């Protein structure tokens, strides 16, 4: 599979997981802003390049966000570039840590096809 196809699947799996947690704010892949699609694609490429664990995946995601000017706030606001997950992996709630485990598992599964 191509990286963009894998990123799309990862995005949709994450969207479904968020909905299961009561968060319906995630758009479908087709409606997602470019920065969100690029973030998923960056994550796929990180995992394709080697065995990146959940912690490394989160750290790479956070470094990308910091470079783009994102900061921590308790509520996500994409227009203001504020996100509650802008904390070290260990400080994330378990349900947020799970996203990194799920993302890695989906990438590995699709790369093995």
Residue ranges and their predicted role:
Residues 1-113:
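Alpha-helical propensity feature that highlights long, continuous alpha-helices across diverse contexts
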